[in-house]
């Protein structure tokens, strides 16, 4: 449950070429004393790293998103699994080793809880947010971030799966949340009852078993057509089960970016 960051200082001699260290402990490592079963979260997937521009706070930061789940034992029901989205504000700064040696490591308790909430304010001093999954749900695949929205799939085993020898199909849910504050992506967010916000964050997938990570596809234009109407909208898919990702623009290739330049 540890997240590491490394800075590569080009042109330096080998002894000073790389600096780095742990910046977050989201599982048992971050618990003082003996962790409970609830706190023993396991992580099997690489973090989903994206550059976010927060227009309200007029700043940019790196969002590091990752979910917990015991993939080696998907029927395990002991841990209280969560989805985490950390904030690293040192987007354009190369940190010296002394900064990593004294780094204030992000713990689970440092993050703002957004489950059962809407329009949560994540301030510039907050280290990020977390979403506690409903009971028995876990995340067994990587998330993906597009257009400041995070897409990820959770899995919950059949109610009797842990007590039987049969595999069971289980149920998969597709989540779609704001990368900025974890809000559900809905048109009525200003009036949405927080009590049903978690339901609005997810949809039930038809496929059983452990579903793969979501992916975003950008189909080629229709070759037999001319004009803007021929452009195909982006398409999100989890395996062969596809969905509307909620945005229409095609990606813009960015080869580099600079501090102060949007």
Protein language model regions, located:
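Beta-propeller fold recognition
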Residues: 1-262
């Amino acid at each position: 449950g540890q997240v590491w960051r490394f800075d590569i200082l080009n042109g330096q001699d080998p002894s000073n070429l790389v600096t780095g260290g742990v910046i977050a402990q989201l599982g048992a490592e971050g618990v003082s004393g003996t962790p409970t079963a609830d706190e023993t979260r396991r992580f099997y997937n690489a973090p989903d790293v994206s550059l976010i521009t927060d227009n309200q706070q007029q700043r940019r930061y790196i969002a590091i998103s990752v979910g917990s789940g015991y993939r080696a034992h998907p029927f395990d029901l002991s841990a209280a699994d969560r989805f985490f989205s950390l904030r690293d504000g040192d987007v354009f700064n190369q940190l010296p080793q002394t900064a990593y040696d004294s780094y204030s490591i992000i713990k689970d308790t440092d993050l703002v809880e957004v489950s059962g909430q809407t329009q949560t304010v994540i301030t510039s001093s907050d280290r990020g947010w977390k979403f506690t999954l409903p009971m028995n749900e876990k995340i067994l695949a990587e998330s993906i971030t597009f257009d400041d929205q995070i897409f990820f799939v959770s899995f919950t085993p059949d109610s009797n799966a842990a007590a039987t020898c049969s595999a069971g199909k289980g149920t998969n849910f597709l989540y779609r949340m704001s990368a900025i504050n974890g809000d559900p992506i809905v048109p009525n967010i200003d009036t949405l009852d927080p009590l049903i916000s978690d339901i609005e964050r997810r949809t039930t997938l038809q496929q059983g078993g452990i579903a793969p990570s979501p992916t975003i596809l950008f189909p080629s234009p229709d070759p037999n057509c001319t004009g803007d109407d021929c452009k195909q909208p982006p398409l999100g898919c989890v395996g062969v089960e596809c969905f509307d990702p909620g945005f229409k623009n095609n990606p813009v290739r960015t080869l580099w970016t600079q501090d102060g330049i949007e």
